[in-house]
A protein has these predicted regions:
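Amphipathic alpha-helical segments typified by the pilin-like N-terminal helix
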Residues: 3-44
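Short alpha-helix boundary/capping motifs
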Residues: 2-3, 59
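Short, well-structured segments within or immediately adjacent to enzyme catalytic domains
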Residues: 40-216
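Short intrinsically disordered, low-complexity coil segments enriched in acidic
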Residues: 1-2, 49
Length: 216
């Protein structure tokens, strides 16, 4: 019977060291790949939300939905999403099914970015400038969405973005440039959907303020 040489301690430690080095190299690569996949999913979801919003406008005399988060009954005017409570990082704050664009999607999970750890039921924010006078809302039945014709450069005007949660305010579903801010969940970038339906990943600091306005 031939003699079988066993592993020496040095050989075993060498193998362990090589495995540790490979793990240190490969784990960040795997993490980046997973995050890229999550970002791609987020981009797809924003495209669906933008498409649903534009379909809503086509069915409502070319007028966009209101960003205000109130409910006026299924199929009626109301906010693009319903916000049920003003408390941060508690599950179920949002009820997409009561939002005005939900009949065009009917898929609540797409309202949450897979990289969003807060899990409130919504990760996205509507451009507040597209509802020109939300303060004047006095109750259900009032509609303050902007006519599509008023948007002079739809390819340059932001429709949705990923909202920062916990930045001095709740993640309330609408973005006000001076209040709530885009988050940077995807390697320092945030996904932005524009009024023509396309989506880009951008550095929030590089987005000019006029991209939030419907006028040039």
């Amino acid at each position: 019977m031939p003699f079988r040489k066993g592993w020496t301690l040095i050989e075993l430690l060498t193998v362990i060291a090589v495995i540790a080095v490979l793990a240190a190299i490969l784990l960040p690569v795997f993490h980046q790949a997973r995050e890229k996949a999550r970002q791609a999913t987020c981009i797809s979801q924003l495209k669906q939300l933008a498409s649903a919003t534009l379909m809503y406008a086509q069915d409502h005399d070319e007028v966009l939905p209101c960003f205000w988060d109130y409910y006026d009954g299924e199929g009626k005017f109301g906010g693009w999403i319903f916000y049920s409570t003003f408390a941060q990082c508690l599950p179920g704050n949002f009820d997409p099914s009561k939002g005005s664009i939900y009949p065009y999607i009917r898929n609540a999970p797409i309202y949450t970015c897979p990289s969003d750890r807060c899990r409130q039921g919504n990760s996205y924010a509507y451009n507040g400038a597209l509802s020109p006078n939300p303060v004047a809302k006095v109750g259900p039945g009032f509609h303050f969405g902007l006519p599509l014709a008023a948007i002079q450069e739809p390819a340059n005007i932001i429709l949705f973005t990923e909202e920062e949660t916990g930045h001095g305010s709740t993640d309330d579903g609408h973005h006000l440039p001076e209040g709530n801010y885009p988050t940077t969940r995807h390697h320092g970038r945030s996904n932005f959907a524009f009024c023509d339906g396309h989506v880009k990943a951008l550095l929030p600091d590089n987005v000019p303020s006029q991209n939030f306005r419907y006028w040039p």
